[in-house]
Amino acid sequence: MNDKTNPAPATEVVDENHIIAERREKLAKLRENGIAFPNDFVPTHLAVDLHAHYDSLTKEELAAKKIHVKVAGRMVLKRVMGKASFATIQDRSGQIQFYINDEISGADTHGAFKHWDMGDFISAEGNLFKTNKGELSVECSNLRLLSKSLRPLPDKFHGLSDLETKYRQRYVDLIVNPESRNTFKARSNAIASLRRHMLDADFMEVETPMLHPIPGGATAKPFITHHNALDMQMFLRIAPELYLKRLVVGGFERVFEINRNFRNEGVSPRHNPEFTMMEFYAAYTDYRWLMDFTEGLIRAAAVDAQGTAVLTHQGRELDLSKPFQRLTINEAILKYCAQSGKSYEAIQLDDADFIRAELKKGGENPDSPTLKNAGIGALQLALFELVAESHLWEPTYIIDYPIEVSPLARESDTRPGITERFELFITGREIANGFSELNDAEDQANRFRKQVEQKEAGDEEAMYFDHDFIRALEYGMPPTGGCGIGIDRLVMLLTDAPNIRDVILFPHLRREEE
């Protein structure tokens, strides 16, 4: 995917270099005159609080109260009009206007202000008042330059239009785009909501290793590194699952972790090699309990982040307030295949040769290492991913996955070959994956052996055999349910973001050309 728009014209680059040179000269003069970057100003108020408390007062009421404030922020608007000037500053909460004139601020201070630039950090001390137009402002009796900006901000009309620059220079994006700031505030609120609800449900938050001697807990290709002191190969974790289940073995019956995972795979609008997940495990629960609990978590996160569970995503309504539907893989294929221009009978979905032919028509390679020796369950899953997955707009649990693609999930007591597993899809994206955990050490060891066979046959994403995890299970693990929720994709839903890079502060990009 190419995020680049047209490069800036040469004249714009020349103009920017000229502006930077001028600002460096101003900074040099500041250094000559004393402390160029003072660090002794402490604000007493934030912009949002001033507006909340005093916007409703009339000009006369505000003047009578004589509210004295100290405020600081980045100058994002400047108007010089002879003996009076206005500046709008932006702090972490919002914006407020400064009023500067010769009489109140002093002619020398006002004169110095005229040479300050957009992007500079400035502080003001003075009384609140309202202009003739009714705008709440600070009448500056004391005004200072706190930090000089050497680079010009993008102009407010064109903004930051180049997507790669937006992602690479997120600091500029956050300065000039309130939408981006709101996105990451919503992300923070959503994560805080998840954490709060986990703690309220008596889960304990833990931290497990990021460097693993054996990659495990998911089927994915890991990043590889080397531990110099121990002289051993290590892997950035692809999932914390096996460590969290070790903690359940150890007696922590409800645990969760919010942290990074790393998978050495492709980059796309819905994939970033470094991503955030929340995984949680609860003893004496199963996948049905997990589905109910996860549904409540996501609904609460939406309300806490955006104030409602009924959202708009990419121009369509997304209602998280209604019960999430639950379908098996085959039920989903039959229900949604028409939206991919297909029509199937239920009996056809038990025909491996038929499914292989359909996969080939859809551009898939049925002879790939993943599918070459696949059983009917894995083939059905591949067909689901081809013709149904992208059409699951409303929240949908796909349940009862085949055992051959679920090496860590408990097998159903009544349906051999089927596991008690679900994946949650919303707007055609996988958001969560959970299951009743396999706690039979001998069964788990046999499944690891089959994974090793698949890896030896060319499947790079197949799991390794983790002997220590088997040893942990041999001490006994209670019946347990576990689930992982993709935080980045969840935030995409909550903030109407079309690309996962829009919700990650510093997404992965190609190396910048010097």
Swiss-Prot record:
UniProt subunit comment: Homodimer.
Main enzyme class: ligase
GO BP terms, alphabetized: lysyl-tRNA aminoacylation
Protein's recorded name: Lysine--tRNA ligase
One annotated GO molecular function: ATP binding
Coiled coil: none
Catalytic activity: tRNA(Lys) + L-lysine + ATP = L-lysyl-tRNA(Lys) + AMP + diphosphate
InterPro entries (UniProt xref): Aa-tRNA-synt_II (IPR004364), aa-tRNA-synth_II (IPR006195), aa-tRNA-synth_II/BPL/LPL (IPR045864), Lys-tRNA-ligase_II (IPR002313), Lys-tRNA-ligase_II_N (IPR044136), Lys-tRNA-synth_II_C (IPR018149), NA-bd_OB-fold (IPR012340), NA-bd_OB_tRNA (IPR004365)
Keywords: Aminoacyl-tRNA synthetase, ATP-binding, Cytoplasm, Ligase, Magnesium, Metal-binding, Nucleotide-binding, Protein biosynthesis
Highest taxon listed in the record's lineage: Bacteria
Residue numbers binding Mg(2+) 2: 430
